[in-house]
Amino acid sequence: MNLKHHFLIAMPSIKNPLFRRSVVYIYQHSTEGAMGILINKPIHKYTIKNILNKLKINIEKNIDMDKLNHPVLFGGPLSDDRSFILHSPCYSFKSSVNISREITITTSNDIFNTIGTSSQPEKILVALGCSEWGKGQLEQEVIHNAWITTLANLKILFNTPIYDRWYESAKIIGIDIRNISSEIGHS
């Protein structure tokens, strides 16, 4: 099972507040483990503009301010001081890796110089921090019904309102996740 470029959709049985009702985009998965970014947990009152100010990047007058007001997401509990930017492919930044034909991840701050300008990638999602699973850990969590998995969907990743992503991610595979009991078992 390779879950790279997939969503993990938290089952209602997950009680950990970090992952409760979460959707995680898996950007790396191998026999050694997996890494992903939560895509539906905004950081309260924290926007791309806050990051630009923190990095002391000058905001030009002709910048599209709507793009600067996009919320920054809590990507996970690890490296929470580091930016993880999912975006549509474009020219490469200092630290960019293509995940699929449609998605690139960048972890270098040079991408922020393009935000709100004509050089910005067409689609963009900014998160602080990431989530990580050790060798075999994610596979065990899937086997034990902690997650539903599905191929990543660009509409959900970039266009669906943040608070609707959990429900909508399950809906694309025909599941009304609100009707699943939090009590699970094996027969």
UniProtKB/Swiss-Prot annotation:
One of its GO terms (cellular component) is cytosol. It holds the Pfam family DUF179. InterPro entries: AlgH-like (IPR003774). It comes from the Bacteria. Gene3D superfamilies: VC0467-like, VC0467-like domains. Belongs to the UPF0301 (AlgH) family. NCBIfam families: PRK00228.1-1. This is UPF0301 protein WIGBR1650.
